Amino acid sequence: MGLLPIWVKNMEKNGIDLKEQKKQLRGEIRKLRKSHTDEEIHQMSLAVLERVQALLEYQEAEVVYAYMDCRHEVETRDLIRLAWKEGKRVAVPRVCGQEMKFYYITSFEDDLEDGSFGIREPKEKNPAYVEDALLLMPGVAFDEKRHRVGYGGGFYDRFLEAHPDLVTIALAFEFQVKEEVPFETFDIRPARVITERRTLT
């Protein structure tokens, strides 16, 4: 029998189940996010943006599925503005019940409204149905094998299961990357994880 991951050993040792492990990790990352200033988050986000911009997958993409950042996630507005400037179409997600759907936006002022979980969401007027788009996704934590811990709603897992041909890149800060994170077999890994310092493939 092979060696068990560290988080499994800790889980068995402490009698903590997978759900509780993820909950504790989310709390840890939330504190780390709050410990950084807005300016620090902005500068680190610009470094992530530069790495995304250099990727062939980004350069060749005609459609980018992005996200509207909140609560000290990797900022996306500068990246979205860049994509618009380069003639790419940009869509962002809207939560519809238990589903997540993407809608095109061409303006932060005209095409967005207050939505679920305090996140700005697109108005339901221009749905996106491109199956080979580049999808930039957030997350709470990742490990060096690209396993992802999300926010617990399962929206991205369900969306990616239904749209397997999307090119997926997760954006994160280095403090969100751990040696190992708890994961389940149905969790879908992004093709790459990009931080301000490196790209995990």
Predicted regions and their residues:
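Conserved phosphate- and dinucleotide-binding cores of soluble alpha/beta proteins
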Residues: Q98-T201
